[in-house]
């Protein structure tokens, strides 16, 4: 039987890290078993579902590279199918109309709470004969009485629920809109889902859904309920820990490979290995290797992984993601080096693409003034002679290459009998406006000959003015 999994988010908010991890695990379960992955949008909460959230979910999935084989399916477009099944269940007696008022239900719950009993529907309308009336009603599923629901969870092992602890679930509201738990069952059945991967907050839904599947004569999928993600302080993950939308991580300068690698390790492991390509994830992933314990979100670990991927992935590929940040920071690339060359030069120092973009501006744009602290330290009177001599040697070069530039800087230091820093630091501030850059040879090469010479001249004027002031 072909493995078929699904990711079924509700579009009441953006795709967050918890949902993204669930999507990844479900996607990997399909890919690791040469199966199929379905994307389903569970939008039956009409009041809270938004198109913006739907779009953000799709954008996040695409950015992560979690491609789907079917879908996206929308539950709101399948109401006719749900109502068809509800009608069949009413006719077969596996569901019934409940006419109990809100007041009666509230009073029942209050009495049960006062008596220390579990709050559940008492089956008042369960065996009433059909009636022809205009009274409002909900449709309830006739949950089995007695016995238990048992399933083997890939993550948690054997789980058992007593049917007596389950009440008769509402499967259609008074307005005729089918409920979440019912739609999920019909969808999983119709779409041939063989394995459901979802958060542990759905465990209590599982016995109810299994009972409905049995009533429909539908096959029961396998289940894997993954633990929640906590902040590094042990509290439930919130925005202050990093529970932001997936696309916010893109905006903050993370590569999808880094986020995927981080998320897969947030509860799953394969020996002591930390770095996983997507192909390796597919090769090694098993649901049974997911840890039952909650996992703590650690932003420092994510940053470390991001640094690794910025340095190790092909510069041309990193440049395709860096382009978004250059555009976002309004850096015009038309007058400067190829972006992949900048990635090669700056990757070693960069923690994020956002940071990398900001630090690359001087390759493409002239700066209005030197960094005040760096200029005060390095563009002093003592810097005038090194700057003038290195300017002469650079101007005399017959070719503008990294090797030739390096030799010119080295020859300047030798001729003046000073350390490289006495030449390099004033030159660095001169051409970048700041105190940090890659090697000066590659920096000047990428800035370009004309622009480098202009900036050195500007720095010489700056130093001369300081001497004369």
Curated annotation (Swiss-Prot):
<dbReference type="InterPro" id="IPR020058">
    <property type="entry name" value="Glu/Gln-tRNA-synth_Ib_cat-dom"/>
</dbReference>
<dbReference type="InterPro" id="IPR049940">
    <property type="entry name" value="GluQ/Sye"/>
</dbReference>
<keyword id="KW-0648">Protein biosynthesis</keyword>
<keyword id="KW-0030">Aminoacyl-tRNA synthetase</keyword>
<dbReference type="InterPro" id="IPR000924">
    <property type="entry name" value="Glu/Gln-tRNA-synth"/>
</dbReference>
<dbReference type="GO" id="GO:0006424">
    <property type="term" value="P:glutamyl-tRNA aminoacylation"/>
</dbReference>
<feature type="binding site">
    <location>
        <position position="239"/>
    </location>
    <ligand>
        <name>ATP</name>
    </ligand>
</feature>
<keyword id="KW-0479">Metal-binding</keyword>
<comment type="similarity">
    <text>Belongs to the class-I aminoacyl-tRNA synthetase family. Glutamate--tRNA ligase type 1 subfamily.</text>
</comment>
<dbReference type="GO" id="GO:0005524">
    <property type="term" value="F:ATP binding"/>
</dbReference>
<feature type="binding site">
    <location>
        <position position="125"/>
    </location>
    <ligand>
        <name>Zn(2+)</name>
    </ligand>
</feature>
<dbReference type="GO" id="GO:0008270">
    <property type="term" value="F:zinc ion binding"/>
</dbReference>
<keyword id="KW-0862">Zinc</keyword>
<dbReference type="InterPro" id="IPR001412">
    <property type="entry name" value="aa-tRNA-synth_I_CS"/>
</dbReference>
<feature type="binding site">
    <location>
        <position position="127"/>
    </location>
    <ligand>
        <name>Zn(2+)</name>
    </ligand>
</feature>
<keyword id="KW-0963">Cytoplasm</keyword>
<dbReference type="InterPro" id="IPR008925">
    <property type="entry name" value="aa_tRNA-synth_I_cd-bd_sf"/>
</dbReference>
<dbReference type="InterPro" id="IPR014729">
    <property type="entry name" value="Rossmann-like_a/b/a_fold"/>
</dbReference>
<comment type="function">
    <text>Catalyzes the attachment of glutamate to tRNA(Glu) in a two-step reaction: glutamate is first activated by ATP to form Glu-AMP and then transferred to the acceptor end of tRNA(Glu).</text>
</comment>
<dbReference type="InterPro" id="IPR033910">
    <property type="entry name" value="GluRS_core"/>
</dbReference>
<protein>
    <recommendedName>
        <fullName>Glutamate--tRNA ligase</fullName>
        <ecNumber>6.1.1.17</ecNumber>
    </recommendedName>
</protein>
<dbReference type="GO" id="GO:0004818">
    <property type="term" value="F:glutamate-tRNA ligase activity"/>
</dbReference>
<dbReference type="InterPro" id="IPR004527">
    <property type="entry name" value="Glu-tRNA-ligase_bac/mito"/>
</dbReference>
<dbReference type="Pfam" id="PF00749">
    <property type="entry name" value="tRNA-synt_1c"/>
</dbReference>
<keyword id="KW-0436">Ligase</keyword>
<feature type="binding site">
    <location>
        <position position="100"/>
    </location>
    <ligand>
        <name>Zn(2+)</name>
    </ligand>
</feature>
<feature type="short sequence motif" description="'KMSKS' region">
    <location>
        <begin position="236"/>
        <end position="240"/>
    </location>
</feature>
<keyword id="KW-0547">Nucleotide-binding</keyword>
<comment type="subunit">
    <text>Monomer.</text>
</comment>
<keyword id="KW-0067">ATP-binding</keyword>
<dbReference type="GO" id="GO:0005829">
    <property type="term" value="C:cytosol"/>
</dbReference>
<dbReference type="GO" id="GO:0000049">
    <property type="term" value="F:tRNA binding"/>
</dbReference>
<dbReference type="InterPro" id="IPR020751">
    <property type="entry name" value="aa-tRNA-synth_I_codon-bd_sub2"/>
</dbReference>
<dbReference type="Pfam" id="PF19269">
    <property type="entry name" value="Anticodon_2"/>
</dbReference>
<dbReference type="InterPro" id="IPR045462">
    <property type="entry name" value="aa-tRNA-synth_I_cd-bd"/>
</dbReference>
<feature type="short sequence motif" description="'HIGH' region">
    <location>
        <begin position="9"/>
        <end position="19"/>
    </location>
</feature>
<feature type="binding site">
    <location>
        <position position="98"/>
    </location>
    <ligand>
        <name>Zn(2+)</name>
    </ligand>
</feature>
């Amino acid at each position: 039987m072909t493995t078929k999994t699904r990711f079924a988010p509700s579009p009441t908010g953006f795709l967050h890290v918890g949902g993204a991890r669930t999507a990844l695990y479900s996607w990997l379960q399909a890919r690791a078993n040469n199966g199929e992955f379905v994307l389903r949008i569970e939008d039956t909460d009409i009041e809270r579902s938004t198109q913006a959230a739907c779009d953000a979910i799709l954008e996040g999935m695409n950015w992560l590279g979690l491609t789907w084989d079917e879908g996206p399916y929308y539950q709101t477009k399948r109401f006719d199918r749900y109502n068809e099944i509800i009608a069949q269940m009413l006719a077969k007696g596996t569901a019934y109309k409940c006419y109990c008022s809100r007041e009666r239900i509230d009073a029942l719950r209050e009495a049960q709470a006062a008596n220390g009993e579990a709050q559940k529907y008492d089956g008042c309308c369960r065996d009433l004969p059909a009636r022809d009336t205009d009274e409002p009603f909900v449709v309830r599923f006739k949950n089995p009485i007695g016995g238990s629901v048992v399933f083997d969870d890939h993550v948690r092992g054997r789980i058992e629920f007593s049917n007596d602890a389950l009440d008769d679930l509402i499967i259609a509201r008074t307005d005729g809109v089918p409920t979440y738990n019912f739609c999920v069952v019909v969808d999983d059945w119709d779409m041939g889902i063989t394995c459901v991967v979802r958060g542990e907050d759905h465990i209590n839904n599982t016995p109810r859904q299994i009972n409905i599947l049995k009533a429909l004569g539908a096959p029961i999928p396998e289940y894997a309920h993954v633990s929640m993600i906590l902040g590094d302080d042990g509290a439930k993950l919130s925005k202050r820990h990093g529970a932001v939308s997936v696309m916010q991580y893109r905006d903050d300068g993370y590569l999808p490979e880094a986020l995927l690698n981080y998320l897969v390790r947030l509860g799953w492991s394969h020996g002591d290995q930390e770095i996983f390509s997507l192909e390796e994830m597919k090769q090694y992933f098993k649901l049974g290797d997911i840890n039952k314990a909650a996992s703590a979100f650690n932003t420092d670990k994510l940053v470390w992984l991001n640094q690794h991927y910025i340095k190790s992935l092909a510069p041309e590929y990193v440049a395709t993601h860096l382009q978004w940040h250059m555009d976002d920071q309004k850096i015009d690339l038309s007058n400067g080096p190829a972006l992949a060359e900048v990635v090669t030069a700056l990757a070693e120092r960069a923690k994020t693409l956002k940071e990398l973009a900001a630090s690359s501006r001087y390759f493409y744009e002239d700066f209005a003034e030197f960094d005040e602290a760096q200029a005060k330290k390095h563009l002093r009177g003592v810097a005038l002679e090194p700057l003038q001599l290195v300017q002469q040697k650079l101007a005399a070069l017959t070719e503008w290459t990294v090797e030739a530039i390096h030799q010119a800087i080295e020859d300047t230091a030798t001729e003046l009998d000073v350390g490289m820093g006495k030449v390099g630091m004033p030159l660095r501030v001169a051409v970048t406006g700041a105190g940090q850059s890659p090697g000066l040879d590659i920096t000047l090469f990428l800035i370009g000959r004309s622009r480098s010479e202009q900036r050195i001249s500007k720095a010489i004027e700056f130093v001369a003015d300081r001497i004369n002031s």
